[in-house]
Amino acid sequence: MTRTTVPLVVALALAFAGPAAAADPHPPLKPVPELDLQRYAGTWHEIARLPMDEQAECARDVTATYTLDPGGTIAVRNECTRTDGSRLVAEGMARRGDAPAKLEVRFAPRWLSALPFVWADYWVIALDDDYRWAIVGEPGRDYLWILSRERVVDARTLDGLKARARMLGYDLRELIVNP
């Protein structure tokens, strides 16, 4: 290579690598190291979430109930109240992924469960030591749920959970806080 070719190649490499490196300044998302499914099971109240099509009709009273099945899977029942007062219910199942707090969830019929695209990542990325609150997300940071065992949390707790989500790399400009 000539003397002018090397700087040109380096400049082009940096030009293409720069935007890719700047696209996501946050390290890869990691789940919490341990998750006791016995303690995690039960009903969680959604305090806040990032928008998603599947919950577009949910106006309030959003809950997720997890029940351990004998075979090691988890029955999932999501419920919410629509703006007209009617209830919306979605039932599915979850299974462990390749780490204790990496779960996969599906709401497609059981007979489709062999298809990989019906499963979505459900990672517990922050968890109270006493399992009073949890932050759930997925590797792309497109989805986020702030959950609590209580129907409401005080403003200080919510501010702390939002700050934690921001530290984990979430953009909360579109965060929906349940009434």
Stretches with model-predicted labels:
Residues 7-17:
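Bacterial N-terminal signal peptides
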Residues 19-179:
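A beta-rich soluble binding module of mature secreted/lumenal proteins
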Residues 1-5:
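Positively charged n-region of N-terminal signal peptides that target proteins for export
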